[in-house]
């Protein structure tokens, strides 16, 4: 079917990209995080994957994004970028993913709305000050794993669940925070593999591809050293042992910023997580609309941030 509105979304995406790139070059961003990304890109390129996690430097990211930063480091070394050009280059992967998220919103919206409304919805994201500040000015990379989470949800909602296994694997390989979206994948498996047209062949096929996604993660981890990667995940998951770190959530509202976790508050945090998952189960299976995957995803992200402990800005 011909898309009569294609030119509008292309122009919107191009303008949003250029705007982000310019702002990304003008503003360095969050000094600590940008120093990490720049330092990591140089370190992983100069020392290689195998030595990266053994270097005497701070690193709290899994290997997934290190592959991206390796390319960034190679380009930076080749062209000798510095200052604004360097800032823009480091932010470029997140900027590209930000734009792709907007395009994906357009694609999903077109299934229910007109071309014009779909373009408007995509533009609301592409020109949302919060996403621009987060990505281009602040220099954060949330849009990278957000893109893969949305692709996972998209493939599940389109009954192409096999692709979702690989999207989720890549996402976990980029940021372990993606684990909070595990219930969505489980819901998709229950609904698309077990409830609808269940068969032994279908189960084995999905099991095979699920294992393949895990094998993909293992293969990508090998250059870094399996033990190094496992240590990195366990260290990252155990970091920020506080009720909240500069996060505007329930604990921040109670004045608990940077307050260490006690045995009691740790239990409370787990209770909240169980309650969040239980509520997402209720909402998912009560809804008959296929958009429930997106809604439950938003619900999990919002409620986890607002109620869980160890959240940070």
PLM regions and their residue ranges:
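Specific aromatic-rich, kink-prone transmembrane helix
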Residues: 104-107, 144-161
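Start-transfer (signal-anchor) and selected internal transmembrane alpha helices
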Residues: 1-22, 110, 118-120, 208, ...
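Hydrophobic alpha-helical membrane-interfacial segments at the cytosolic entry of transmembrane helices
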Residues: 11-15, 197-224
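Transmembrane-helix motifs of polytopic, lipid-linked glycan transferases
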Residues: 88-112, 272-285
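Transmembrane-helix signature of polytopic, membrane-embedded enzymes
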Residues: 81-85, 105-129, 163, 288-295
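Extracytosolic helix-loop segments that constitute the early lumenal/periplasmic catalytic or substrate-binding loops
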Residues: 33-60, 64, 71-81, 226-232
